Every structure is written in C-alpha cells, then in structure tokens.
C-alpha cells in the first residue's frame, strides 16, 4: 500500500510538472518575438532603418513560422518532440540575445530569421508532447501552451518600456538580450524536468 501511494504521489507530482512545462513552452513561442515592437523606434533610430526595412523586420517572423513549420515536423519525426522543443528554445533564446550585438540591418535580419526558425520548429513539437504527457486531458494540455503564448504576448509588450528598458539604460540591445534569458531557462527546465515526466504513465488529474 505504501509503495502504491508513493507511486501515485510521484505520478501526480510529475503531472503538475508537465502542466508547468507545457505552459512555459507556450511562453517561449512568443516572448522574444513580441520583445521587438516596444523598442522598434530605438532600433530604427540606432540603425537608421527606413520604413520599408522596419516592415521587413516585423514581417520576417511570420514568414518563418510558415516556412519552417514543415522542417519542424520532420525534426519531431526524426529526433522526437522533446529534443526538437529543447533545440528550438535554445536557438531562439541565444540568438535573441545576439540580436543586440548586430551592427547593421542585414545582420539583424539574419539573426531574426534564425531566431524565428527556432521558434517555428518548436510549434510542431507541442501537440505530440501533450499527447504523451496528458493523453487523458489533451484539450487541457493544448489550452495550457495556448495560454502561455497569450501571456507572453502581453508580458513582453507590457513590461519592456516601464521596467526592462530602465534596468538596461534604455538600450534596445540589452532589452532583447534580457528577453532571451527566459527561453534559455525554459530550455534548461525542459531538459532536467521532462525526462522523468516522460517515463511515468499518465493518468487524469
């Protein structure tokens, strides 16, 4: 009986870890993308961007979401959903920070393309993870990462100007680096917390 209770406790604990990981993965889908609009005027002034160049910068992520979705699905099939999620988070988080080191618009475009591709390959990994971790609560699992996505859109826009920019001396470069850090942290959480979650049988909450 004691062994059964301990196993049930572990299963419940890891179920809640799965809840947190799915929500955080949703946060990672938008956080670095929506960090740009609040500082776009600073970027435009610093790099002397034209209106057309600003438009291209804003549109690149959307284009990459479409282009890289299929390769993302192939990566999930080849390496697994968790490995693809971790790779996407790491790419997006690191390259988001590197955007602050760019010296011209061409390099900024290149960094934005790589970062957006990292996010795009993450998206096909989430439905398989929901099915693996929450087979009895697929709708709930899907709602989790969707909610994380929406919260991330709000956080980046809401906090950048009043909080993040003052902390980094009104530097758009450091602001983008700051917003890349959560993705690296989520990546680490996925690496260390998801393995035991994946090994345990799932059951309804």
Where are these regions (language model features)?
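Extracytoplasmic
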Residues: 17-51, 69-72
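Helical-face signature of the major facilitator-like transporter fold
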Residues: 22-26, 30, 96, 104-116
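Small-residue-rich segments within alpha-helical transmembrane domains of MFS-like 12-TM solute carriers
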Residues: 30, 34, 116-124, 154
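Residue-level signature of mid-helix packing/kink "hotspots" within the transmembrane helices
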Residues: 34, 62-70, 154
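Conserved MFS/SLC helix-loop-helix module at the cytosolic interface between two early adjacent transmembrane helices
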Residues: 67-106
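A generic transmembrane-helix signature of 12-TM secondary carrier transporters
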Residues: 89, 93-96, 111-112, 180-187
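Helix-loop-helix hairpin linking two adjacent transmembrane segments in secondary transporters
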Residues: 104-107, 136-198
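Cytoplasmic helix-loop-helix junction between adjacent transmembrane helices
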Residues: 111-148
């Amino acid at each position: 009986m004691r062994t059964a209770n301990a196993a049930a406790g572990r299963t419940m604990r890891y179920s809640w870890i799965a809840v947190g990981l799915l929500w955080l993965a949703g946060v990672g889908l938008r956080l670095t993308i929506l960090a740009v609009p609040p500082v776009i005027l600073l970027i435009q002034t610093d790099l002397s961007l034209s209106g057309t160049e600003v438009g291209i910068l804003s549109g690149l992520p959307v284009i990459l979401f479409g282009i890289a979705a299929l390769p993302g699905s192939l990566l999930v099939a080849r390496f697994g959903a968790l490995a693809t999620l971790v790779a996407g988070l790491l790419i997006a988080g690191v390259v988001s920070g590197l955007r602050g080191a760019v010296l011209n618009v061409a390099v900024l475009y290149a960094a934005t393309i790589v970062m957006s591709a990292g996010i795009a390959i993450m998206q096909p990994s989430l439905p398989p993870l929901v099915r693996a971790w929450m087979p009895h609560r697929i709708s709930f699992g899907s709602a989790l990462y969707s909610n994380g996505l929406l919260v991330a859109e709000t956080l980046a826009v809401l906090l950048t100007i009043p909080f993040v920019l003052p902390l980094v001396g009104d530097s758009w470069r450091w602001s983008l680096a700051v917003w890349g850090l959560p993705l690296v942290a989520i990546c680490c959480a996925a690496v260390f917390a998801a393995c035991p979650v994946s090994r345990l049988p799932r059951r309804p909450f």
